[in-house]
Swiss-Prot record:
Any coiled-coil regions, as ranges: none
Pfam families noted in UniProt: Acyl_transf_1 (PF00698)
Organism: Homo sapiens (Human)
Protein name: Malonyl-CoA-acyl carrier protein transacylase, mitochondrial
Disorder: Optic atrophy 15: A disease characterized by visual impairment in association with optic atrophy. Atrophy of the optic disk indicates a deficiency in the number of nerve fibers which arise in the retina and converge to form the optic disk, optic nerve, optic chiasm and optic tracts. OPA15 is an autosomal recessive form.
Length: 390
């Protein structure tokens, strides 16, 4: 992906939206220097193979952006971003799309309100793209030299906006519908998600089968218990009916699980219990003008790059009921010949969970990882990758 393509991706996906006027974004103040102005001449670029840029530049000159998902939200996120160009305009646009003050909720909470699926997904989406604005302001070469992006669950929408596949307001609208539909589906069935740290001999699929049989013995029809996230070797998230997850916790030693922990989410995301949410999201995506990404974006569903707009339409809806193949995505992005260096990796958005996962998937790639702080007001990119995930 050439530098010019990466530039036009960002201007098309976000910066260009500022020039559309009141329909989506306020017109920027006179003299404001933002992504749109900087990249105004970045048009007409020819597309190349996704990693062609790395053939012409040292790997360390290239960058990869990772966008976090639900669970990374924390009261105060966005505080460290408000002094950067365009960020307040992003939150103003979000208020019009959502119908409530997302910035106020992100900054002041309360946490239990922010944690609701209907609120945290839009909050993470906007904070992540605001973090990109901060990164662009401090290190514009990172945006110019980006060769790939990936997002965890709802983070995939932010990655696609960054890559120019959809406009900010349209992407946020899709996230809003997605979050509302997932919240409603979650409330229909007592369900949840269980983080499981296993061992090489752990029997994840057998454990899920046993848990489903246990639920059937209790009279639960069509019980759900399945792997919903592949995080890193021997670590999975299993989702399903609450009774199934309690069974797994009680019998963790039988399945060689080292540690289990219930996640603070409202339902069994990325399982068939989310099927009621598929149609609302599918209809919402029909209203979104999706374009081919100009920076390679990897799908959660199969850990391969998106190829065309129809691909995106289909897989974003399918993602709701499919496991997130994040471990496989990390291998797809960072696998390379022995002796070849790694790109810089930036986690853009709240938390450092994706950095911790990258460390467990690929230690060498993690050595070039940084997190863009969304909490502090200090004007720097936080380069400490060792803080544990929240």
């Amino acid at each position: 992906m050439s530098v010019r393509v990466a530039r036009v991706a960002w201007v098309r996906g976000l910066g260009a939206s500022y020039r559309r006027g009141a329909s989506s974004f306020p017109v920027p103040p006179p003299g404001a220097q933002g992504v749109a102005e900087l990249l105004r001449d970045a048009t007409g670029a020819e597309e190349e193979a996704p990693w062609a840029a790395t053939e012409r530049r040292m790997p360390g000159q290239c960058s990869v952006l990772l966008f976090p998902g639900q669970g990374s939200q924390v009261v105060g996120m966005g505080r460290g971003l408000l002094n950067y160009p365009r960020v307040r305009e992003l939150y103003a646009a979000a208020r019009r799309v959502l119908g409530y003050d997302l910035l106020e909720l992100s900054l002041h909470g309360p946490q239990e309100t922010l944690d609701r699926t209907v609120h945290c997904q839009p909050a993470i989406f906007v904070a992540s793209l605001a973090a990109v604005e901060k990164l662009h302001h401090l290190q514009p070469s990172v945006i110019e030299n980006c060769v790939a992006a990936a997002g965890f669950s709802v983070g995939e929408f932010a990655a696609l906006v960054f890559a120019g596949a959809m406009e900010f307001a349209e992407g946020l609208y899709a996230v809003k519908i997605r979050a509302e539909a997932m919240q409603e589906a979650s409330e229909a069935v007592p369900s949840g998600m269980l983080s499981v740290l296993g061992q090489p001999q752990s029997k994840f699929n057998f454990a899920c089968l046993e848990a489903r049989e246990h639920c059937k013995s209790l009279g639960i029809e069509n019980p759900v218990c399945e792997v919903s996230n592949y995080l890193f070797p021997d670590c999975r998230v299993i989702s399903g009916h609450q009774e199934a997850l309690r069974f797994l916790q009680k019998n963790s030693s039988k399945f060689h699980f080292r540690r289990t922990r219930m996640l603070p989410v409202s339902g069994a995301f990325h399982t068939r219990l989310m099927e009621p949410a598929v149609e609302p999201l599918t209809q919402a995506l029909k209203a979104v003008d999706i374009k081919k990404p100009l920076v390679s974006v990897y799908s959660n569903v199969h850990a391969h790059r998106y190829r065309h707009p129809g691909h995106i339409h289909k897989l974003l809806a399918q993602q709701l009921v499919s496991p997130v193949k994040w471990e496989q995505t990390m291998h797809a992005i960072y696998e390379r010949k022995k002796g070849r260096g790694f790109p810089q990796t930036f986690e853009v958005g709240p938390g450092r969970q994706l950095g911790a996962i990258l460390k467990s998937c690929n230690m060498q790639a993690w050595k070039s990882y940084s997190a863009v702080d969304v909490l502090q007001t200090l004007e720097h990119v936080d380069l400490d990758p060792q803080e544990p995930p929240r």
